[in-house]
């Protein structure tokens, strides 16, 4: 890890799998990198992660610890617990520095990044040629009294991550969003005993309900009172009419919120869900600003997918920095 400096090639905002994967690849390219970690991981409630090659069954917090350790082993690496408050563009993007018949590098700029220290750490203000936004998303669960207590230990949001453990069991999908029917079709490949609970919200159309019925998926639109269960997990969904539907666990579709107030001055393009719009290489609508992981479309995916996204965008950033000397002056 290098001594503290005030100027970097890349500032990475967020220290999840996307941000740390990108940071690791960038320091290996001898780029001067600062990772700013607000220490609010979306997977904080999840006890075990799945599907990460060589790390299946590893807790997400352990994956983050190992990733930080590997990143900080390089002399160009810096890491700080700090919540980014503002990113300001200080200069117009420089011209595209390199072009061939098959590849054109992106433009980079100059930015000031201001961050407030967390957990007793100091504030930090630095400048950087590029910024990678890998903040992930904030989750808003349906407003049920006990749902947060079971989240990560009986109710999950990632079907690809946790569907296997509920194979052939009676399971629930709680969701109030317009894509809940599509998610139910996906979940139905793990169990033929699935009930979709929309909590009184008209989230499933008649056509979607017919399609779900063909797959043996029930739809219960009654208002929910609460989730029932104990230390071993979820046992049922209690409705406001007093009845309970027995389940062994299941899934919830949160509403996801992109917290990008710190980048408001850059007017970054986003889709209808608030996710950042990027090109296939991770470049945002503002030259020199990139995004990776859950903050980009299609939103939350497996940890290994986010890590791969970070590695891919790191390669883009390094190419776009051609002509800017590395930490070793090359």
Identify the residue ranges that each predicted region occupies:
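FAD-site-proximal beta/loop scaffold in flavoenzymes
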Residues: 143, 149-165, 254-300, 312, ...
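A Rossmann-like FAD-binding core segment of flavoenzymes
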Residues: 65-128, 191-277, 319-330
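A conserved FAD-binding loop/helix module that cradles the flavin
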Residues: 23-24, 181-185, 292-330
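Residue-level detector of alpha-helix initiation sites
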Residues: 16-17, 139, 178-179, 296-297
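FAD-binding core/adjacent interface of flavoenzyme oxidoreductases
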Residues: 1-8, 80-168, 276-280, 284, ...
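Beta1-alpha1 glycine-rich phosphate/pyrophosphate-binding loop at the start
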Residues: 3, 8-66, 179-202
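Active-site glycine-rich loop that binds ribose-phosphate moieties when present
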Residues: 153-161, 173-183, 205
